[in-house]
Swiss-Prot record:
Cofactors, names only: Zn(2+)
Cofactor binding annotation: Binds 1 zinc ion per subunit.
Organism this protein belongs to: Leptospira biflexa serovar Patoc (strain Patoc 1 / ATCC 23582 / Paris)
Domain of life (superkingdom): Bacteria
Quaternary data: Part of the 50S ribosomal subunit.
UniProt keyword Nucleotide-binding present: no
One annotated GO molecular function: metal ion binding
Gene: rpmE
Protein name: Large ribosomal subunit protein bL31
Function: Binds the 23S rRNA.
Stored SUPFAM superfamilies: L28p-like
Family: Belongs to the bacterial ribosomal protein bL31 family. Type A subfamily.
Binding sites annotated in the UniProt record for Zn(2+): C16, C18, C36, C39
Record's keyword terms, sorted: Metal-binding, Ribonucleoprotein, Ribosomal protein, RNA-binding, rRNA-binding, Zinc
Pfam families on file: Ribosomal_L31
């Protein structure tokens, strides 16, 4: 087998926008993410209200249906 063909597997820190830092190992070094399990709505149980009109509502509004 060939030697030294695999990438270096080094200690890395994953930094979230909320300030959480998770230490792990990676081939790419330090990683920055926007959302993690500490601030994601699925894991926290807090839902975010997204005020968007659905396709059906847009259709009804366009054709003035009730």
């Amino acid at each position: 087998m060939k030697t030294d063909i695999h990438p270096k597997y080094v200690a890395a820190k994953i930094k979230c926008a909320c300030g959480t830092v998770i230490e792990t190992r990676s081939t790419s070094g330090d990683i920055s993410v926007e959302i993690c399990s500490n601030c994601h709505p699925f894991f926290t149980g807090k839902s975010k209200l997204v005020d968007t009109t659905g396709r059906v509502d847009k259709f009804k509004k366009k054709y003035k249906m009730k």
